[in-house]
UniProtKB/Swiss-Prot annotation:
InterPro entries: AhpC/TSA, Peroxiredoxin, Peroxiredoxin_AhpC-typ, Peroxiredoxin_C, Thioredoxin-like_sf, Thioredoxin_domain
Xref: PROSITE patterns: THIOREDOXIN_2
Designated name of the protein: Putative peroxiredoxin sll0755
Organism annotation: Synechocystis sp. (strain ATCC 27184 / PCC 6803 / Kazusa)
Subunit and partners: Homodimer; disulfide-linked, upon oxidation.
Remarks, miscellaneous: The active site is a conserved redox-active cysteine residue, the peroxidatic cysteine (C(P)), which makes the nucleophilic attack on the peroxide substrate. The peroxide oxidizes the C(P)-SH to cysteine sulfenic acid (C(P)-SOH), which then reacts with another cysteine residue, the resolving cysteine (C(R)), to form a disulfide bridge. The disulfide is subsequently reduced by an appropriate electron donor to complete the catalytic cycle. In this typical 2-Cys peroxiredoxin, C(R) is provided by the other dimeric subunit to form an intersubunit disulfide.
Length: 200
């Protein structure tokens, strides 16, 4: 029986082969302890929505590293398929060189552990997870296969997580962006925030 994946609990560890800088390397979740990690699953190589997501995260990779965050992509394809896709030009449907590892989950064990495996199709749904420096799952979202995710929203949530972890007496309200007002979760102290957003 698969354990229930819960925000606030340790993220399931894994060890797998990945493509890193066009070479085969072993990647472990525990390697990223001490940094934040954006871990995202996608259905298959050589498809349609998937390359748009992978390229977008790669092109904005520096924005994640500036936040002490690594990015890792995972699908049920083999590492050989990942490599072939990376070595295919973007104009031909490939992804070209990317700035983070692509992990092979050929046995589908990682997808199962993160509860994103679509059993009938045998592929992963578009799950995205943000794991903190202690290896604790802080955020989880899963899309159906036909629509992609937002790099902007991932960065927004990541910044909110970092903020509340460095300011544990504060919480971030709806649509919070870096630099916006936060609130203190206390009936009296929260009034300071609500007074600033109240309708005239």
């Amino acid at each position: 029986m698969t354990e229930v994946l819960r925000v606030g609990q340790p993220a399931p560890d894994f060890t797998a082969t990945a493509i890193v800088d066009q070479s085969f390397q072993t990647v472990k979740l525990s390697t990223y302890r001490g940094k934040y990690l954006v871990l995202f699953f996608y259905p298959l190589d050589f498809t349609f929505v998937c390359p748009t997501e992978i390229i977008a995260f790669s092109d904005r990779h520096s924005e994640f590293t500036a936040l002490d965050t690594e990015v890792v992509g995972i699908s049920v394809d083999s590492e050989f398929s990942h490599l072939a896709w990376i070595q295919t030009e973007r104009k031909m449907g490939g992804i070209g060189n990317i700035n983070y590892p692509l992990v092979s989950d050929l046995k589908k064990e990682i997808s199962q552990a993160y509860n994103v495996l679509e059993p009938d199709a045998g592929i992963a749904l578009r799950g995205l997870f943000i794991i903190d420096r202690e290896g604790i799952l802080q955020y989880a979202t899963v899309n159906n296969l036909s629509f992609g995710r937002s790099v902007d929203e991932t960065l927004r949530v990541l910044k909110a997580i970092r903020h509340v972890q460095s300011h544990p007496n504060e919480v971030c309200p709806v649509d919070w962006q870096e630099g916006d007002k936060t609130m203190i979760p206390d009936p009296e102290k929260a009034k300071t925030y609500f007074e600033t957003v109240a309708e005239p």
